[in-house]
Structure formats: structure tokens, C-alpha cells
Design a protein with these regions (language model features):
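Preference for short coil/turn "hinge" residues that link or interrupt alpha-helices
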Residues: 5, 25-29, 137-140, 196
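Boundary at the C-terminal end of the N-terminal hydrophobic targeting segment
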Residues: 16-18
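Short structural boundary motif marking the start of a folded domain
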Residues: 21-23
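Secretory pathway targeting signatures of secreted, lumenal, and periplasmic proteins
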Residues: 26-128, 159-169
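Short, well-structured beta-strand
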Residues: 103-111, 115, 124-221
Length: 221
């Protein structure tokens, strides 16, 4: 009976995950697209038609996201919409909603991002990685939708916290692109029993959402 109950619970969880609505992100220049769960939060919302119609002379600094308007899920001491040390220009960035784990303070942020590494002018520089990286591991190469990427595990550390995750580099049509997942954690200490633990199941949920976006990435031209 216990085995049957466990099977049914797992089956329902898998069904629920699969049934989560997906959205499609297409870059403003039509270069790439990917699908992402509508659970994720857009850290870099695209300009709307109304924004585009507003005369440039009437725009003020309030028309652009400020530090105060950044969603909580996208905010961290470290870089979340680019690899730490990558110095890239973020093109897309989606975060897992922080409020889902508000009672688990060790979870700070988790994002999937796409950035252009403008300083990498050729394939060798691009695929060698950024000189300012703290490289945890270099994992070789992989293929995502017929495009080859070199994989690095990169991160950063500070007092009572840190971040890490994979960075995927490719040189496409004369430009260097980096896809990545970064997870930020707090190592602050709490009295036993005062907070809940961020579990393996929690991490599986977060990583699954972000990797779905990563694995659906495709260049359109």
C-alpha cells in the first residue's frame, strides 16, 4: 500500500510539472529563442509597443529598471543575469521566484541567463573562458540543439554566501555567447529548528525549471 501511495504521489507530481504552461522567449533581433515555465520571473522585460512609441525626448530615467525596481528573485550580492566575472551584456534572464522558499533562507536566487561576451572577438578567446572567472571545473563540451558549447563550472564566494553554476560558451556568427545557470546560497547560521532546510527535492524543482529553458535554446539564424 505504501509503495502504491508513493507511486501515485510521484506520478501526480510529474504530471503537474509536465502540465505547467510554457512561454517562448525570442530575442529582439530574432537570433535565438527558448521556452520557459511561466513560473519563472523575467528579470529583463522587453520594451513594450507603448514604450517604443514614446518619443525619446520624453523618456526619463524612470523609464528604465532601477535597482529599486529589480524583482526580488533577480537580486543578489553577486551576478545573477551573467556569470560572475564574465563581464557580458545580458540579453535574457529568468529567475525562480524567491517567495516560494521564503521560509528557507539558505536559498537566495537561481537564474537562467543568456549574455553576449562583447570582449571576446574571436573563437579562441570566447572558448578559453573569461580571465576573471573563478573556475571550479572545466567539463568539456556538449551539444544543445545541434550547436556545440564548452562547459565551465564557475562561481564566487563572499562572507556567509556564494554562488555557482555551469556556463556554456559558443562562438556563433562572429559573436561569443554564454548561457548559464547561477544559484546563490546563504551560509548564515540559524538556531536549530528556527528555519526550514532547502532540500534536494527543492533543488530538483528549481534546477528542472532552469534547465528546461537551457535545453530548449536554439539559434534561429
Amino acid at each position: 500500500m505504501k509503495a502504491l501511495i508513493a507511486f501515485l504521489v510521484c506520478g501526480l507530481a510529474t504530471w503537474g510539472y509536465a502540465q505547467t504552461p510554457l512561454k517562448t522567449f525570442t530575442s529582439s533581433d530574432g537570433l535565438f529563442r527558448f521556452s520557459y515555465s511561466d513560473v519563472l520571473i523575467d528579470c529583463l522585460p522587453q520594451p513594450t509597443a507603448a514604450d517604443s512609441a514614446t518619443p525619446a525626448t520624453s523618456k526619463t530615467s524612470t523609464d528604465h529598471p532601477s535597482a529599486l525596481s529589480i524583482p526580488a528573485a533577480c537580486a543578489s550580492q553577486g551576478a545573477t543575469c551573467d556569470g560572475p566575472g564574465s563581464e557580458g551584456a545580458s540579453v535574457a534572464c529568468f529567475a525562480y521566484p524567491k517567495e516560494r522558499f521564503k521560509d528557507k533562507p539558505s536559498f537566495v536566487a537561481a537564474t537562467f541567463y543568456v549574455s553576449e561576451i562583447e570582449s571576446a572577438k574571436n573563437k579562441k578567446i570566447c572558448m578559453d573562458g573569461s580571465p576573471d572567472w573563478f573556475v571550479i571545473n572545466s567539463k568539456g563540451v556538449t551539444t544543445i540543439n545541434h550547436v556545440t558549447f564548452k562547459i565551465f563550472e564557475i562561481g564566487d564566494n563572499w562572507m556567509n554566501g556564494g554562488q555557482s553554476g555551469p556556463a556554456y560558451r559558443t562562438f556563433h556568427n562572429g559573436k561569443c555567447y554564454e548561457l548559464g545557470i547561477q544559484t546563490v546560497s546563504s551560509r548564515a547560521e540559524y538556531d536549530p529548528g528556527t528555519v526550514k532546510e532547502f532540500s534536494k527535492e527543492d533543488w530538483s524543482e528549481v534546477e528542472g525549471r532552469l534547465r528546461n529553458a537551457l535545453n530548449s535554446f536554439v539559434f534561429l539564424k
